[in-house]
């Protein structure tokens, strides 16, 4: 919803659940796309095609092993980044657990802990994070308010509109807010978003 509000303010239209029938460039350098959504034509100056990510696991020679992949081509791993073949681990983008540098590094930490440590780290212990590199950028770490409440936490919420943040005012980017969610019983940090 937040991304839609940002795009609406920029006069960027989003079309959901539609397949492209055809796309062509017009004489005035605009692009027209015909979609299955009511057969509508959409004309604009730019076209963003977001098709998702595909791992390059087909280049690893896995067909010569018994290592299993899922239907999207990611290598199947358990909570410890172990494949179905004993002693073989899959870390980073190839396991489908998050295509981020910090996630890949955490995969390494889990495997290192399994091989040389206390064997007590696992993927499910990972704190949920994400970032959307749009303008303004969006990001989250940990639980949302809804998740915290549904997990039985009594929460405190610190909320600060961006129009009250000096740096945001200085840059003229005052849309949105920052928020932190804290466990009201023990002051434990549960999550934050911007």
Label for each model-derived stretch:
Residues 2-14:
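Helical element adjacent to the flavin cofactor pocket in flavoenzyme catalytic cores
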Residues 9, 21-22, 56, 94-194:
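Mid-to-C-terminal Rossmann-like scaffold of FAD/NAD(P)H-dependent oxidoreductases
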Residues 13-14, 41, 68, 154-156:
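Conserved beta-strand segments of alpha/beta enzyme cores
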Residues 16-18, 71, 159:
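Short loop/edge segments at beta-strand edges and connector loops
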Residues 24-41, 47:
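Conserved beta-strand-loop-beta-strand element in the redox core of flavoprotein oxidoreductases
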Residues 25-31, 85, 171-176:
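A short, glycine/Asx- and small/polar-enriched loop/turn
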Residues 27, 37, 63-64, 71, ...:
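Short acidic-glycine loop/turn motifs at beta-strand connectors
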Residues 41-117:
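FAD-site-proximal beta/loop scaffold in flavoenzymes
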